[in-house]
């Protein structure tokens, strides 16, 4: 049985955010690097650096947290895996869902690479819906 690397990075980031950890280390692959670059560009994480250990590459992510002393801690990241190995979900560019009226993003795997829902709509291409982030 294969590993679902996208679900692994989503779970790692979600667990670190719930545990209020500032740094997360995930395995580096082409698809994880592309997803992390989208998260960085959209402002969901603060920093990314590539780390090598025993001939294996890892991405070290610095998460963005809201600290408010008056209220209890709130998670800033909500991630949900949509298309999975057992059930692939595809969409054309006209039917790509809008998350929270455009406040969240949808990450898609298209024929032109991994991109956000806004980029896919502008280019007029659809693809496999990987995850929602809000």
From Swiss-Prot:
InterPro entries: Ribosomal_uS8 (IPR000630), Ribosomal_uS8_CS (IPR047863), Ribosomal_uS8_sf (IPR035987). The keyword Cell inner membrane does not apply. Gene3D superfamilies: 3.30.1370.30, 3.30.1490.10. The keyword rRNA-binding applies. One of its GO terms (molecular function) is structural constituent of ribosome. It holds the Pfam family Ribosomal_S8. Belongs to the universal ribosomal protein uS8 family. One of the primary rRNA binding proteins, it binds directly to 16S rRNA central domain where it helps coordinate assembly of the platform of the 30S subunit. This is Small ribosomal subunit protein uS8c. It comes from Solanum lycopersicum. The gene is rps8.
């Amino acid at each position: 049985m294969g590993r679902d690397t996208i679900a692994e990075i989503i779970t790692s980031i979600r667990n670190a955010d719930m545990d209020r950890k500032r740094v997360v280390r995930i395995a580096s692959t082409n698809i994880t690097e592309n997803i992390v670059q989208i998260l960085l560009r959209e402002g969901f994480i603060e920093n990314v650096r590539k780390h090598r250990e025993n001939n294996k590459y890892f991405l070290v992510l610095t998460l963005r947290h809201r600290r408010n002393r008056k209220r209890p801690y709130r998670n800033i990241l909500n991630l949900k895996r949509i298309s999975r190995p057992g059930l692939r979900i595809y969409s054309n560019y006209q039917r790509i869902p809008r998350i929270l009226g455009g406040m969240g993003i949808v990450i898609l795997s298209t024929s032109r690479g991994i991109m956000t829902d806004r980029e896919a709509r502008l280019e007029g291409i659809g693809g496999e819906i990987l995850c929602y982030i809000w």
